[in-house]
C-alpha cells in the first residue's frame, strides 16, 4: 500500500482550510457512571481518547471549574459540553498530537480540539477518510510536547500534506478507498489466523 501513496501527488494545506475547529470544554471531569453512554475524550494516546463514560445527567451537573457546592465556577449549558460526533479529536496537551475519530456524540476536556469538515472544501467526513486524516495529523506529533503545546492558535496555522486529484483539491475518494483497503487487508489477515 505504501507504493500507492508514493505514486500520488501531494499538496500542503492549512488545517484551518480543511477543518472547522472547536475548542474543547474547560470543565471538571463529570462523576463517572457505571451506566454512562457518553464518552469523555481526554488527552490520551490510547482507547480512542476515551478516558471514562458518563450519563447526560452527570455531564449536565459538572461545573465549569471548581466545586459546585462552593459555587466556584459557573455551570454551563449542556449544549456547550456535548459535541456532535463524526469528527476528529486532536489532543493539544498531555499526549499531544494524537488524533481519534469520534463517530458519536461525546464530551471532552479543553485538552482536546474537535475538528469537523469545513464545508468550504466541499467534503463530507466519514469513518474512512477520517481515519486516513488521523494518520496524517499524527505525522505532526513530533513537533509538539508538553512544554510546547499544540493549542488552537498553533493548530489552525499548522500545515498537513494531503493527496490531491487532478484539479489540486484533496482527493477524498482516494483517502476513503485507501482506508477501506487497509481495513480489508487486516480483516483478511485476522480471518486467516482464525481469530
Question: Can you describe what each PLM-predicted range is?
Answer:
Residues 1-26, 31-49, 166-195:
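Non-catalytic DNA-recognition/assembly elements of restriction-modification systems
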Residues 17-159:
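DNA target-recognition domains and sequence-specific DNA-contacting regions of bacterial/archaeal
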Amino acid at each position: 500500500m505504501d507504493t500507492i501513496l508514493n505514486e500520488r501527488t501531494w499538496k500542503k494545506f492549512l488545517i484551518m482550510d480543511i477543518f472547522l475547529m472547536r475548542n474543547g470544554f474547560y470543565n471538571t471531569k463529570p462523576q463517572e457512571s457505571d451506566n454512562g453512554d457518553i464518552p469523555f475524550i481526554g488527552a490520551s494516546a490510547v482507547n480512542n481518547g476515551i478516558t471514562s463514560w458518563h450519563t447526560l445527567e452527570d455531564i449536565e451537573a459538572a461545573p465549569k471549574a471548581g466545586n459546585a457546592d462552593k459555587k466556584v465556577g459557573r455551570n454551563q449549558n449542556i449544549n456547550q459540553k456535548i459535541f456532535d460526533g463524526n469528527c476528529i479529536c486532536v489532543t493539544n496537551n498531555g499526549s499531544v498530537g494524537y488524533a481519534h475519530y469520534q463517530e458519536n456524540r461525546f464530551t471532552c476536556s479543553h485538552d482536546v480540539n474537535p475538528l469537523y469538515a469545513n464545508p468550504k472544501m466541499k467534503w463530507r467526513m466519514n469513518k474512512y477518510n477520517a481515519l486516513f486524516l488521523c494518520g496524517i495529523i499524527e505525522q505532526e506529533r513530533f513537533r509538539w510536547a508538553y512544554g510546547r503545546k499544540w493549542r488552537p492558535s498553533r493548530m489552525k496555522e499548522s500545515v498537513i500534506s494531503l493527496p490531491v486529484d487532478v484539479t489540486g483539491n484533496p482527493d477524498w475518494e482516494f483517502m476513503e478507498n485507501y482506508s477501506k483497503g487497509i481495513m480489508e487487508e487486516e480483516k483478511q489477515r485476522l480471518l486467516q489466523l482464525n481469530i
